Regions:
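Flavin-dependent oxidoreductases
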Residues: 20-129
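A conserved beta-strand/loop element that lines the FAD pocket in flavoprotein oxidoreductases
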Residues: 5-17
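Alpha-helical scaffold segments in soluble metabolic enzymes
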Residues: 3, 51, 55, 170
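Flavin-binding catalytic cores
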Residues: 59-61, 77-79, 104-106, 114-171
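Rossmann-like NAD(P)H-binding beta-loop-alpha module
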Residues: 1, 6-7, 25-26
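Hydrophobic, well-ordered secondary-structure segments
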Residues: 1, 14, 46-50
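Flexible, glycine/proline-enriched loop segments at strand-loop-helix junctions
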Residues: 7, 36-38, 157
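Short amphipathic alpha-helical segments at helix-loop
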Residues: 15, 30-33, 151-152
Length: 171
């Protein structure tokens, strides 16, 4: 960001975009009470990047389907079992890395993440739900293709999400 700014670029943090208008020589970006004018845009909107791209007049072939990863922390007396990162052998048929063990800088050890569909783009808890986000997910054909291909894995991931015993057993 510093290099970008040093060359004349502007960075607007914490500025939710409500509307983007394409002009002949650039864009008008509306955010709250402010309007920004730009010749070019750099989209760093994370989980909202596909929505911003569509607002800018692009038609991306992809959509972001939000997944949430959950971690469990080892009991302190079990932390000595893991001295370094441990990754599973990847399954080339799966789009996810798999649950791994990570020794943190404070000596604790975490196991995770799993991968479960988030019911909201920024849904980090099971209780985070957005009906508009769900409607967008379910309206996207790519979601149904993914679901048809990995439905068994999806069910297993949810079982492990709702049962710590099943999560631990799968390690």
């Amino acid at each position: 960001a510093e290099l970008f700014q040093s060359r004349g670029g502007l960075v607007h943090l914490n500025s939710p975009v409500s509307k983007i208008q394409k002009k002949q020589d650039g864009y008008l970006i509306h955010s709250g009470q402010k309007t920004f004018e730009a010749r070019n845009l750099v989209n760093c909107a994370g989980l909202h990047a596909d929505q911003i791209a569509r607002q800018a007049g692009l038609r991306p072939k992809l959509r972001i389907i939000p997944f949430r990863g959950e971690y469990y922390e080892f009991k302190p007396e079990r932390s000595k079992l893991v001295n370094h990162l441990i990754y599973p052998v990847p399954d080339p048929l799966m789009p996810f890395l798999g649950v791994h063990f990570t020794r943190m800088i404070d000596g604790t050890v975490e196991a995770g993440p799993n991968a479960v569909l988030a019911w909201r783009r920024e849904g980090y808890r099971r209780s985070d739900i957005s009906l508009p986000d769900l409607a967008e997910i379910f309206a996207f054909g790519g979601f149904w293709k993914l679901s048809a291909r990995f439905w068994k894995t999806g069910i297993e991931e949810y079982r492990r999400s709702f049962s710590k015993k099943q999560f631990v057993k799968s390690l």
